[in-house]
Amino acid sequence: MINDIQKRTAERMQKSIEALKHEFAKIRTGRAHPSLLEHIRVSYYGNEVPLTQVANVAVEDARSLAVTPWERNMVQAIEKAIMTSDLGLNPSTAGTVIRVPLPPLTEERRRDLIKVVRQEAENGRVAIRNIRRDANNELKAALKEKLISEDEDRRSQEQIQKTTDQFIKEIDKLLEQKEADLLAV
């Protein structure tokens, strides 16, 4: 039972880390990355679908992306979706390939993005701590029902705290890497 709680706790914490990595991937650094356009939705025969379902997004060079629609008639819709996104990008079309140049980040924009990244990291830490609290509550309930001894409860809480510390360190490391990416010119 204790092992189940610890295993479930570690799995949930790992999912929180994955969610944080996904959020970090959306935040633009100075380099081009296909995940930058992942959240853009395109009108496709009356339905809103993710850009990645109607086109191939590839890195052309460090500061530009190439979007190649799978259907010729989608070029205008994709171009419009990129322009109206909150990324402030200005695509240009050459035949069926849409080139998306990424303007360099201003110092002010970098500072704003660092604030956003720090907030996302803090949200990740809070999620990890909430998972720890849930696990500790499960242990207390098991102790109350006499399913585990006080020693087992204490040992398990210490183990869960170690796991929590490990995942918080991982979040701090991810934050440090993302900040370094944002500050790199």
From Swiss-Prot:
GO terms for cellular component: cytosol. SUPFAM superfamilies: Ribosome recycling factor, RRF (SSF55194). Pfam families: RRF (PF01765). Gene3D superfamilies: 3.30.1360.40, Ribosome-recycling factor. Keywords: Cytoplasm, Protein biosynthesis. The keyword Translocase does not apply. GO terms for molecular function: ribosomal large subunit binding. The keyword Repressor does not apply. One of its GO terms (biological process) is cytoplasmic translational termination. It comes from the Bacteria. It is found in: Cytoplasm. Belongs to the RRF family. PANTHER family: MITOCHONDRIAL RIBOSOME RECYCLING FACTOR PSEUDO 1, RIBOSOME RECYCLING FACTOR. Responsible for the release of ribosomes from messenger RNA at the termination of protein biosynthesis. May increase the efficiency of translation by recycling ribosomes from one round of translation to another. This is Ribosome-recycling factor. It comes from Methylococcus capsulatus (strain ATCC 33009 / NCIMB 11132 / Bath). The gene is frr.
